[in-house]
Design a protein with these regions (language model features):
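Negatively charged
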Residues: 1-297
Length: 297
C-alpha cells in the first residue's frame, strides 16, 4: 500500500493459491506492468485492488473472477485504466464472471478513461451499486458518446442502493429501463449530472419508458438533478408511496415534461427545489398530497 514508485515486472508470479488481492496496488501510482497471465481463480477479494493506481492500464479482461465476492472500489480513481486501450476506446472486452460478487460500490468511480462493454456481466448477487460509475466521464458501455446500442442486461433484483451510481457520468446513455429495482431503497443523485442520459433515447425524446419498480424506494433526492437530456415517462410499476425526500429531483432537468400526476406523495416531507429551473415542465400536479411536506421552497 502506498508503493508510489513501484513499477517492476511481476507478471510471472505464481498466484494460483492467492485468495485475497484486496488493496494490492492501492495508490501504486507508477505501476503499469503486464499481469494478464496471473491465475486468479481462487481469489475472493479484489476490493480496492487498483484504488488510485493512476498509471495502470493493462488488459486483464481474461482473468478468472468466478470466485470473487468483493469488487468495491476496485478501479476507483484508476484514471488511466481502460483495460489496455486508449481512453474511451472499447475493443478490449472484459468478459468477467461476476456471479458471486456482492458489492460493486465505487468500482469505477472517477475511472475517467474506462469505456468497455460490460453489459453481459452477471450481477444477480450484487446488493450495492453505490457510486459505481460516478465521474466515469468516458463510460457509455463500450460505445461512443451519443450512441446507445450496447444494452446493459444486468440482473439488479437484489440491489438495495443505487445512490450516485451514474452521478456525473456525463456521456452515459444506454437503455436500462427494464432493470428490476424493486429492492432499491435509495436513488439519491442516481443520474445527477449525467447530462446525456435519456435512457438510450435522443435528448428530450420520450420513446424509452423507465419501467422500474420502486416499492422499496424511500429517497430520490437529486435523482435527475442536472440530467439535462432526460425526458422519459415512468411505467406503471413506479411507486413513490414510501418516498420521504423529493428535494431537487428534477432541478435543472431542462427537458423533462412528463405526466407524473399519479405519484404518491403522502409521505414526502421535503420537496425543496424539486422543479427548480426545470424550464420545460408544465404538468398537472395539483392533486398531490402535500400534507406532510415541511419544506417546499
Amino acid at each position: 500500500i502506498n508503493a508510489t514508485v513501484f513499477n517492476q515486472d511481476i507478471g510471472n508470479w505464481q498466484t494460483g493459491n492467492v485468495t485475497n488481492m484486496g488493496g494490492m496496488f492501492t495508490r501504486a501510482s507508477a505501476f503499469n506492468q503486464d499481469i494478464s497471465n496471473w491465475q486468479t481463480g481462487n481469489v475472493t477479494n479484489m476490493a480496492s485492488m487498483f484504488l488510485e493506481a493512476s498509471a495502470f492500464n493493462q488488459n486483464i479482461g481474461g482473468w478468472n473472477t468466478g470466485n470473487v465476492k468483493y469488487m468495491q472500489s476496485m478501479f476507483q480513481k484508476a484514471t488511466a485504466f481502460n483495460n489496455g486501450e486508449t481512453p474511451g476506446e472499447s475493443n478490449h472486452t472484459m468478459d468477467w464472471d461476476t456471479k458471486n460478487v456482492g458489492s460493486m460500490a465505487n468500482m469505477f468511480s472517477w475511472a475517467s478513461s474506462f469505456n468497455q462493454n460490460i453489459g453481459n456481466w452477471n450481477t444477480g448477487t450484487v446488493t450495492s451499486m453505490v457510486s459505481m460509475f460516478r465521474n466515469a466521464i468516458a463510460f457509455n458501455n463500450g460505445e461512443a458518446p451519443g450512441e446507445s446500442n450496447h444494452t446493459m442486461n444486468w440482473d439488479t433484483k437484489n440491489v438495495t442502493s443505487m445512490a450516485s451510481m451514474f452521478q456525473d457520468a456525463k456521456v452515459f446513455n444506454q437503455n436500462i429501463g427494464s432493470w428490476d429495482t424493486s429492492k432499491v431503497s435509495t436513488m439519491i443523485y442516481l443520474f445527477s449530472g449525467a447530462t446525456n442520459f435519456n435512457n438510450g433515447d435522443a435528448p428530450g425524446e420520450s420513446h424509452h419508458t423507465m419501467n422500474w419498480s420502486s416499492g422499496s424506494l424511500e429517497s430520490m433526492a437529486y435523482m435527475f438533478y442536472r440530467a439535462e437530456a432526460f425526458n422519459q415517462p415512468f411505467g406503471s410499476n413506479w411507486n413513490t408511496a414510501s418516498v420521504t425526500n423529493m428535494s431537487y429531483v428534477f432541478r435543472d432537468a431542462k427537458r423533462f415534461n412528463q405526466n407524473i400526476s399519479n405519484w404518491q406523495t403522502g409521505n414526502v416531507t421535503d420537496m425543496s427545489y424539486m422543479f427548480g429551473y426545470a424550464t420545460a415542465f408544465n404538468q398537472p400536479i395539483g392533486g398531490w398530497d402535500t400534507s406532510k411536506v415541511t419544506n417546499i421552497k
